Amino acid sequence: RHDIAAVRVVPRPGDAPMTLDTVHVDLYFFLDVDLVLLNVEVTANHLPLETAQELMYRFGRAYPAGWDPRGQALHCLAQAEWLDAQGQVLAASDANQRDAFLAQVSSRRAPRISAHWDFLMRPLVGDHSDHPGLLRFRQIEYYRMPQMAYLAMDRPRDLTRSDFVRLGLVTGSGARDPAGGCALPYGEQHLAEFESKYCYDRFWTEGGAAPNTRYLCNGHAMVVVGDASSQFYACRDRGVLAQFRHQHFLVFLIAHFQKAALLMYSDRLAETLKNLDISDPASVRHFKRAIRSGFASFLRFTHRYWFHEVAEQAQSRALFRMCSEHLGLDALHGEVKTRVS
C-alpha cells in the first residue's frame, strides 16, 4: 500500500503522541499455500530506550488482551492512527470499545481485529466480520504479531542485563531506580540461560566493522542492537541495516511462514473432522476427498518449503536455527505430519 505515510501513536494513557514514519506496507503471498503475511515497517529517530521498549511491546497486537476496571485496553497502544501524506487520519484504533470486541467473541466465537489493522488488510476482510467481501482471511498465528527491531544506540555497552532481557523478550520498559537501573522482568533462575538461549554474540566485541553489535532472538521477535556511531552498522546499502532489512528479514519470514503453514494444515484437518457425519454417505465421500487433498497439499509443502537450512552464511544460518528452535518447528512438523498421514 502506498496511501499510508505515517502512524501516530500514544503508547500508554497520558503519554504524548508521537509520529512514526512508514517505510512500506506489504502483503506476502505464497505459491500453493493459502497464507498471507502482513509486513509493516516503521521508523523513528532519537527515541529514549524506554519509549522504544514500549513501542515494541505494544505496537503489533491484533486486538487488546483485556481491559482494566476503567475500560482502558491492556498491553496495546492507547491510540494508533494511520496517516496519509497530508497528515489526514485514514483509520484509528478502537481498542477501548470493549463491548464491540466481546460481542463478536460471544456471537462468533472468534476475536475481533482492531479497526486500524482491519483497515490495513483491505480489500481482504476478516472472515468472522460483518463486512462484505470475496477475499476473506482468518488469523492463524498468535495475536502478538512477529516483529523485528533494529536499534542504533549511542553507547550499547551501557545497556544493563535487564535492558537486554526486556528487548530480547519484548516485555516493555520497567521502573527505573534512582541510579538509573531497572529490575529484571522475571526471576533470576528463569533467566539463568538468557545469553546462551536468546543472544547471538559473534559481533558483541570492540573490534570489527560494526563493533558492539548483538542479535537477540526468541522466535517471536528478532532484535539487533548496535552502535549508532558505526558507519557500517547504519549503512542501508551494504551494512548491518541492509542485511537486517533484506537477508535477516527473509530468514525470519521463512521461519514464521513455516509455522503458520503447519498451523493452517492442522486447522484444516480439524475443520474436516468437524464436518464429518459418518451416517451420511455423501459426507463420508467428501471427507475422504478432503483428506486426500490435504495430504497431497501437505506433501507439496514439505517438498517445496520445508527445510532446515536457508543460507550458507554462518550468521544467517545461526539466526534461522534460533528462530526454528524457539518456534518449535520440528516438533510441530512431526505432529502435523502424523495427523495428516
Residue ranges and their predicted role:
Residues 1-4:
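Long, charged/polar, low-complexity intrinsically disordered N-terminal extensions
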Residues 6-12:
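Short beta-strand segments that buttress and anchor functional surface loops
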Residues 12-277:
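Extended alpha-helical interaction modules
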Residues 244-341:
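Membrane-associated alpha-helical segments
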